[in-house]
Amino acid sequence: MKQNSFIYLRGLKHAAFTVFCVENCQKFYYDPQFNVRVPFSSGQQVKRSVLEKLNDILGVQPSPTEFYFDVDKKGALKEGEVLSSCDPHYVDQLLGGWMRTPKGGKEKAVKRRSPLSISAMTPLHPLLSGLPKENISFDRSDRPNAHKVVVRDANGNVLTDEQVCNFLDGNDRSLYRKWIPDNNRATGLFVYDVAIDQRRLFCVSTNQFEPEITADMVESLKADGWTVVNTAFGECLSMPKEQREQLIPAIADALLDWQITSNQARTFSLMETLAVAVSDNANTLAAAIRAKLIDDNESKPKARPIIDENAGAKTFIALPCANYIVTETESADALVRARQELIDRMMAFDYENQL
């Protein structure tokens, strides 16, 4: 029987009073079954966080991106294309995929689908997350002499200090304090899913009718030791084994130990990984880390998180998981073992002889 080409991963994370995606302070969607708003992090943000972690682990720069803008006849700046380098020498390009479609149609479009299919990070169950609001203030009223206040009238003219004082008579306002109400925050138990297509993980197609890379890049990769292999997708170039073996441990680390930090200057959460399930059968992941509705004869439904070690997937339960889920098998080395499981599976795949 042919080896399974996919590795499926489900991770369970805890987030506390933080911000994922900024849209009205925190992106959310409405769950129609339980009539609640639930926060989420988009798959794009999860993917970017994983790739940023990967670059940090390897100590390499991200791939360069070209941003194009057009100035129209009226002198206004218009949005143009955003073009990737389409260079698999960059690990974030190789694993993240790319698309390059220059304006004008004179250059052939080049595109590669990522070998990592990554879900949005959503609540384990709609009833196991929250979207609380926080009212905050930007307050500098303790040292008013150190700061400057500028008040403008309806025409944009700056008022004098005397005019400002006259205006404030009868107005209970502080000019050194900004009130910022209704800031949504995310909290609760969240899951993300990853499917790793090992057939394309370290391979790029050489087909020039629907190209992933240019003909020049094909020659460049061959010169760097990439070898021609035949896969289910046709002729491809495979990364040298020694380079793969350097990347695989970093990929495993990044998939387990990423955090969202882009919006968290003052709402940082550890986003600790509580549990991990790994399998070559996607169905077993949903059973291994799940929630169950509880009927306790109360007006509001409740949900209980469950880690099931007998659902067909290999599960790894970290110590912090016991804060939120009743379990007897949590261990200090759970994530180390999960990392090794991912490494072993990726190392075992025969990238040169896929057919």
Question: Regions from the language model: what does each represent?
Answer:
Residues 1-355:
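RNA-binding basic/glycine-rich loop and surface signature characteristic of RAMP-family CRISPR effectors
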